[in-house]
């Protein structure tokens, strides 16, 4: 028997949730867009640290 989790309950509460079906509407698209945007910011920050274009005063990389 499947266990109920907080994440599962959150996804079930979103509008347009129907397992195995494609329903009209946005569904979980805003959640996916938010996660993608946060990943983009994270990767740009890592790239700036690698290229030393992000100034970090108290951290030295040797």
Curated annotation (Swiss-Prot):
InterPro entries xrefs: PSII_PsbH, PSII_PsbH_sf
Subcellular location: Cellular thylakoid membrane
UniProt-recorded Gene Ontology molecular function terms: phosphate ion binding
Domain of life where this protein originates: Bacteria
Membrane topology: Single-pass membrane protein
BP-aspect Gene Ontology terms: photosynthesis; protein stabilization
Family: Belongs to the PsbH family.
Protein name: Photosystem II reaction center protein H
């Amino acid at each position: 028997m499947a266990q109920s989790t907080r994440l599962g309950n959150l996804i079930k509460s979103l509008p347009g949730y129907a397992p195995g079906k494609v329903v009209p509407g946005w569904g979980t698209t805003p959640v996916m867009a938010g996660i993608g945007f946060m990943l983009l910011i994270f990767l740009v920050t890592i790239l700036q640290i690698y290229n030393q274009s992000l100034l970090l005063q108290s951290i030295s990389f040797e």
